[in-house]
Amino acid sequence: QMCIRDSTSPDHYKNIKSIEMEIFKDNKYIGFSKFFFNKTQKKFEVTNTTNFEVKLMGITVFSVISEGLEIYENDQLIYFKSDTVQNDKKKFVEVFFDEENRNFKINGSSYKGTGNLENIIGNWWNHRLLQSDTQISPLSGSIKKQSVEFLKKEKIRLYENEINVEKFRLKSTDESLPKDKRLDFEIWYDKKRAMIVKIRYKRLGTWEYRLKKVN
């Protein structure tokens, strides 16, 4: 059922310096999420800045400012850190690769403990999200089990381009989670570039992340 097997290794990103996604709510631009890639001989680093705010009658009703860093060595995540302010509430997560115990040590605002190495950081630059059964929240460190279903192949128009994509549904497998904590995303994947190009979800309206620029 899954038709993604071309794994993203840092090599895949060696010629890419950055990607920029624009964020829309109900088709209105509200902010951005940018990822910057830096590859040295041994390490591959991804830094992220996400910034958006939703206004109603000129008053900010929802906002997120987030900074993150992922470090990989030989294709293994060895460190992740992020700090987020969501509506004046601070969220954080720090993940260490524990080589001896072959797991992750997680210190987050909503989870402190260990996680197995199957876990992927839930950031949209990484299409391995579509191959994984479990992810770590890049904002709070919580571990979320997920299922990914291939829906169809289609052609979409994104900005000025028409692209052939594969559409997936990614959702939480734990039905007991409160609705606002559940993963439930439609994801459009460009197999040719091995990149997620669009994400859509519903939460008090329709949200979309759209891949605008690849440098």
Where are these regions (language model features)?
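Short, small-residue-biased leader/transition segments that mark boundaries at the very start
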Residues: Q1-I4
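Acidic, serine/threonine-rich low-complexity disordered tracts
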Residues: T8-F97, R128-N215
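Hydrophobic, well-structured mid-protein blocks that either form specific transmembrane helices
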Residues: S82-G122
